[in-house]
Amino acid sequence: NKGLRFMSVLKRRSNNIKDGQYVIAFSDSRALIDISKDCGMTWTRRQPSDLPNVNEYFFSNDRTRIAMSGDGRHIYCSCYMANVGLLRSTDFLETAEPFKPDNCYSVYSIACNGRGNLVAIVCQNSNNKYDLMLSGDYGKTWTKITDSSFSARTLAVSYDGKYMVIEGGYSYSGARISADYGKTWALKHSVIGNSFALGLSSDGKYAIAQE
């Protein structure tokens, strides 16, 4: 698929659901989304008109990012387009609800834990800085975590949500780690900077950064 830009795959067994059973793929050239519920063997194609009140940029923007719970039920999509915000679904995108936290101009990246209740996003604020914001109730309420001394860009969350890693881009080099569900943070690697993507193992023991 030449236009494929982002894919999300379920990575955990839960309630008799197979590892990798649910797969979601977005295209950057067409306003389409492809969904598989059988490990990619068959696919169902959706378009913006299938989801009322959903901005088509969620389907056709190269900055679209996806986070999915371990059972495939909870799905969060972010779009970097200004004032577009987030998309939330509790039924594997059969239906979806757009929403946006306060003082969040655009969403740069997103991650969630295995249950899908703990959601982390990086938002560009009105001062053109990037804030890390956390929700512990499936995206209903949000708490700003970072301050003016650090601007988050990319992030990753462990399966249980206990461990998180964030990286701050060119001006705020270094990876910061939390081992208490985002309550406190420590600088663990001062060299890493401007990572395109971060990865964290399910137990939080291993992390990888692509620069």
Where in this protein do the model-derived segments appear?
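Residue-level marker for isolated small/hydroxyl-bearing positions within beta-strands
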Residues: A25-S27, S78, I121-V122, E167, ...
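Surface loop/turn motifs at the tips and blade-to-blade linkers of beta-strand repeat domains
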Residues: N1, P48-D50, Y57, K100-N103, ...
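Repeated scaffold domains used in trafficking and secretory/extracellular systems
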Residues: K2-N15, Y57-M68, Y105-C112, F150-V157, ...
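Asp-box/BNR beta-propeller loop motif
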Residues: N1, D34-R45, R88-P98, M133-K144, ...
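Conserved Ser/Thr-centered positions that define the repeating blades of beta-propeller domains
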Residues: I17, S36-K37, S69, S89-T90, ...
